[in-house]
Amino acid sequence: MVIPKEILSDFKELYEKANRLVEEESRNDPPTDPFRSHYKARDVLIVLKKQLDDQLVSVQASEEDGGQDDRCYHSLLAFVCRDLGRIYIYTEEQAEGEKMLNRCLELVTPFKECPEGIIPFIGAINELSIVLASKEEYNKGLEILLEAEKIYEDFKASGLKPLAIQDVFNPPEEGQQSHEAGPKELESLYTLVSFYMAQMYGHLGEPEKSAKCCHRTLHRQLESKTYDPIDFALNTATLSQFYIGEKRFEEARHHLAAATLIMAEYEVHMLEPEMSEKQRQDVSETFKHRYADVARCWAKYGLYLMNTSKLRLMRDEDDEDAKNLEIVLRNMRLVEAEQSRFPGLDLTACENRISCEYCLTFDDAKLVFHFVNEWLDIAKDYYKAENEATEYSKIMQDYAEAYEHIAFFEENPENQAKMQKRRAKYLEDLLDLLDPIFYMKICRECWYGAGTAHAAVMDVRLDIIRATSTPAPEDIKKVNQSCMKAIKHFESYVKSYLVKPPSEEWRPNMDVEEQRHMLYAHFHIGRIYYKLISGHPLQQLEHLTSCHTYYQRFDAGCQLHKEAAETLQGEIGVVREMLQLLPLKINTIKARLNKAGLTA
């Protein structure tokens, strides 16, 4: 490159002025004029672009050096167009921004795999992918990012060193080592390629590929030490939720351990001596907030591990196909787990606090249960009912879920009942706290959860009664109390979906899952009325009539909402048998009442 130093110096001065406006002075822009410095930078770059365009025309006319200056001017012009495009997009002038970014690509495409071209080329593609994502053109965005990835890989294989704009402005003297700005910028750009690819894959419904790109992004940030600790921890913890959903507990635990370690390291030095009291408070508040979020992710890990373990134990022991599939998946995931690690972090101590293996016994589950509660306590310490009611409610629901899962592993029936009552108590306390008008979704979840909890207590109490020849009145009373509490919650749930109680018409626009839960609620109420214990025929008649009413509504609902009823074939069979049996029982009781001279 033989552009005279004085000309390069003039170009450099303009470029650095624009860069200073964007990177430094824009921080002081008033809220009433948020783009002031960016507009100034844009004007400076437009002047620089005009000068470069003019010089390029002049150079192309002479072509004295065989095109070497030509390429240098193309490179500088491409850098300027890239930065102009970025500014236009930031100032919400998307069409102009897109135009500038495409101009950048036109300029460098002929030498995109050369040191002078690769950085502006990949930089422009990254910016364009943001534009395409904003227009929901995810396939097109992914296509150009995949091209950028291939160009990066080919360039790395070539052994050449990329040139940043600083390197173009300051070419090394003969015999000197080249500058290092280029390699660092290229690696940073490729990290962004991985990040944007993760977003595209996510939007295109390919979560596995999205997760791989996310992990690669985080891994590269760690290696280059170019991460914000809070952002890194949050992104890593968020990625763990994908692995949890895939039952890849080893990878999930690894990512949560990484998030926890990075947060712990950050906490040690986050408060600096020169900070004002306000800055210290802000930093501490942000840390507590985000640590609480990581804590909630840990709790979700434990809850999902317990639930998956429970479902696995409930599975048919003779299901050989399921067992063989589990073995195949486990072997496949050993390789995947190795590829989804952060080798530079020592996470052993953090990982050893919790298992990534399925719970097989109560002792296994108890360890996970206590682990979940520890993290929920941390989350609850930040999210308070008075100012974060929704998040507080979710944490309380997580406590309730933990008791639901641990009750499954408990073998002592009395303890099972206690755990289900604790589960119900968390949900009932929430119902006392929340106004259904503003928190209807959460209240519905609590009504349904509390109903199933009390129904579970009822089943345990009934088993205890059946095991004795002469049940104590106190035991019968406990059964009936559990029944009435369960009915109360299920009826509240049902009423919340009715157009106008006492009309039984369901609200329109309920989705299939809501319809299914509504059907289940009717089934539960009918079943529980049938379980109520009474020695008085009038009460027995009342209970059986209520049971019959809800079973009829369940049956009618299943016929009306066939898609929702697809998974309820077992319940449908039971109900239809009961609808044949119940009228006989009801008539028998009525006959007894008539015989005794009592009116039904």
Curated annotation (Swiss-Prot):
Main location, first listed in the record:
cytoplasm
Please give the organism. Drosophila melanogaster (Fruit fly)
Q: What is this protein called?
A: KIF-binding protein
Output the Gene3D superfamilies linked to this UniProt entry: Tetratricopeptide repeat domain
Top-rank lineage group of the source organism: Eukaryota
Any one of the GO CC terms: cytoskeleton
Entry-linked InterPro entries: KBP, TPR-like_helical_dom_sf
Cite the source lineage.
Answer: Eukaryota, Metazoa, Ecdysozoa, Arthropoda, Hexapoda
Family according to the record: Belongs to the KIF-binding protein family.
Q: Give the residue range of the signal peptide.
A: none
Q: Which residues form a coiled coil?
A: 384-434
Q: Which UniProt keywords apply?
A: Coiled coil, Cytoplasm, Cytoskeleton
- Some GO term, biological process aspect, for this entry: which one? mitochondrion transport along microtubule
**What PANTHER family is this protein classified in?**
KIF-BINDING PROTEIN, KIF1-BINDING PROTEIN
Subcellular localization(s) per the UniProt record: Cytoplasm, Cytoskeleton
